[in-house]
């Protein structure tokens, strides 16, 4: 956001939280959860299709829950961190795998009757993870590129991994969405946020387990420093502005 004490926003950019069942701390995650939901929508998941989410940070944990809500089975969560894998299981993943395992692609195939995953959300933005996603994809599978893969430091065999098996790579940047009217698989940011608030109120998606620290805004400098330097930085940190 801006380095300012006040922001002037357009009226249609403001979303009022009208349901008392949604706390202000939970509502704070609606915008980032909408990024995940947009990436999952573009996969057009059908009931019973397998799905995999590469990376279980905040975006990945929401994507995992949305894959499950879309009727995907099994939902496979992937992360290097054991705590994040366990949290993904708590939030509804059917399996959680470590991508460093030598037989990682084999395990994915075993969990999907030898086919590979039909739908995958790549959240990490690491090109090596995209390469692994391609190795695990089913024939004519889809991969949603939710993470920003800015550095192409891994060789991808586009004929063998993309062209020949008919894989669809889908750009899922949050800005690539309709501005005024939603349509199937492509909702406006506002409509996605409203849907997420409804799902939080109905306990269809869970936010509280993702919140690992509630901090005063006065702690911001130290927290941002830790974010840059600490590999084990908490997943979900929320500023409680009432603590000022």
Specify the residue positions occupied by each region the protein language model found:
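Glycine/charged-rich beta-loop-alpha catalytic/anionic-binding loops adjacent to active sites
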Residues: 12-25, 115
């Amino acid at each position: 956001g801006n380095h300012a004490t006040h922001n002037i926003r357009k009226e249609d950019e403001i979303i009022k939280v009208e349901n008392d069942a949604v706390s202000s701390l939970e509502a704070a995650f609606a915008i980032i959860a909408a990024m995940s939901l947009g990436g999952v929508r573009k996969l057009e998941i059908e009931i019973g299709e397998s799905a995999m989410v590469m990376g279980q940070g905040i975006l990945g944990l929401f994507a995992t829950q949305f894959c499950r809500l879309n009727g995907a089975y099994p939902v496979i969560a992937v992360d290097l961190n054991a705590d994040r894998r366990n949290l993904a299981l708590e939030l509804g993943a059917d399996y959680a795998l470590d991508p460093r395992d030598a037989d990682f692609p084999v395990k994915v195939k075993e969990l999907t009757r030898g086919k590979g995953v039909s739908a995958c959300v790549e959240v990490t933005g690491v090109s090596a993870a995209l390469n692994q996603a391609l190795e695990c994809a089913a024939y004519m599978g889809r991969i949603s590129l939710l993470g920003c893969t800015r550095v192409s430091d891994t060789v991808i065999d586009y004929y063998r991994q993309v062209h020949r098996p008919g894989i669809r790579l889908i750009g899922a940047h949050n800005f690539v969405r309709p501005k005024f009217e939603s349509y199937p698989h492509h909702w406006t940011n506002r409509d996605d946020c409203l849907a997420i608030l409804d799902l939080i109120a109905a306990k269809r998606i869970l936010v509280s387990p993702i919140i690992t620290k509630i901090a005063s805004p006065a702690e911001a400098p130290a927290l941002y420093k830790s974010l840059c330097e600490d590999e084990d930085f908490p997943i979900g940190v929320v500023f409680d502005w009432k603590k000022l």
